[in-house]
Amino acid sequence: MNEIIRSDAATLAARIAAKELSSVEATQACLDQIAATDERYHAFLHVAADEALGAAAVVDEAVAAGERLPSPLAGVPLALKDVFTTVDMPTTCGSKILQGWRSPYDATVTTKLRAAGIPILGKTNMDEFAMGSSTENSAYGPTRNPWNVERVPGGSGGGSAAALAAFQAPLAIGSDTGGSIRQPAALTATVGVKPTYGTVSRYGLVACASSLDQGGPCARTVLDTALLHQVIAGHDIRDSTSVDAPVPDVVGAARAGAAGDLKGVRVGVVKQLRGEGYQPGVLASFEAAVEQLTALGAEVSEVDCPHFEYALAAYYLILPSEVSSNLARFDAMRYGLRIGDDGSHSAEEVMALTRAAGFGPEVKRRIMIGTYALSAGYYDAYYNQAQKVRTLIARDLDAAYESVDVVVSPATPTTAFGLGEKVDDPLAMYLFDLCTLPLNLAGHCGMSVPSGLSPDDDLPVGLQIMAPALADDRLYRVGAAYEAARGPLRSAI
């Protein structure tokens, strides 16, 4: 296999800047890998070869002219989850209702990537409107896990994770509403980070649940993820939920972690996120990771988060409620698909026909649940109570951080499950987000870093590291130190 596509992003960037490799060569190598393998994995919904090569050529011209490059990742190609708007590519969000739709504007994340000189290879597959845990809810067919094509790559951002694992791209962008970056990262042995809520702009990120959604970086190493995090983070006046605070030095933290130990770092193990219901191999991998953190000098203790028990129920009331509001905009008048527009139907009938044909079953399910939870007779009993539980979960984590610096848990309760195994059992699918969604409810930051392969089935397992809001640098210090001590893992292909 081409050594270019197996290189990490930091190495590629250094070689491009040193004129040892051109960005066009690196981008073409990734495009060739996509062409050779994506029929098998279906990680991409749209490939933008000409646009990517054009952006790469601009970087090469700057290198040749001796100009200062716009970012430490200039020239390194990237895969973008199809939930971020792009003027030069379709944005479908994995849904038929947006089939062929092109946005009139770029998302802020897209704009920052372009300004950083990062060629965008294309848009990756995802569960429809980011609702799902397996990428099986995409209207355009499921993505397959490169570790085992009969298994799911996780979701909703399985396309971005699979693209990394299949060496189709060295970098990727995802979005995380209840674990959609971290969970696929765990199932594909890649690194995924959910930044602190509000630190990466949501402008142009098509909303699923506005108080939970957060864009974030994905890569194959902690340092690469940090370099990408630094590119996309920062305050944005176009996003009313954007936090006007300095971006932590995540790159410096990653470098320090990789070069040092964890002496003095206090690590908490969440009592509620281990034990019954977890696959034995996942627990074994997690316990080994905790032992490794201890060997690095970390002070490990158990922390109690009693309201995590109610996180799943609260999440699956809050999220559908926001979904039912956000997806009301897809009314057959302004976007994409339109059914029954032949003059024989009223506007209401056109809307009903279009939404019935354009939305998949999981999206319809969540719209109905959310509409019910927000209805006059049930608002206080369901939605209001869920928001109170959300506050208690955030307080649990705040209390934990009084005695520890980071909290750790398995990233998922099991390894990747089989394609079709849970698609007809929504509750089983929802339970798969058990480890990741409390963090979204609290608005804090989290990372999944590979912790090896399960002895049960030889499939990847992820270690989840969590930190308080605006302490994203702690994730990178601990994650990089653990990654260096763990050593290299074999790849999927």
Curated annotation (Swiss-Prot):
A Pfam family the protein falls into: Amidase
Keyword Protein biosynthesis belongs to the record: yes
Catalytic activity as recorded in UniProt: L-glutamyl-tRNA(Gln) + L-glutamine + ATP + H2O = L-glutaminyl-tRNA(Gln) + L-glutamate + ADP + phosphate + H(+)
Function: Allows the formation of correctly charged Gln-tRNA(Gln) through the transamidation of misacylated Glu-tRNA(Gln) in organisms which lack glutaminyl-tRNA synthetase. The reaction takes place in the presence of glutamine and ATP through an activated gamma-phospho-Glu-tRNA(Gln).
UniProt keyword annotations, A-Z: ATP-binding, Ligase, Nucleotide-binding, Protein biosynthesis
Gene Ontology biological process terms in this record: translation
Molecular function terms, GO-annotated: ATP binding; glutaminyl-tRNA synthase (glutamine-hydrolyzing) activity
Record EC number: 6.3.5.7
Protein's organism: Mycobacterium avium (strain 104)
Subunit structure: Heterotrimer of A, B and C subunits.
Protein name (record): Glutamyl-tRNA(Gln) amidotransferase subunit A
An example Gene Ontology CC term for this record: glutamyl-tRNA(Gln) amidotransferase complex
Enzyme class: ligase
Domain of life of the organism encoding this protein: Bacteria
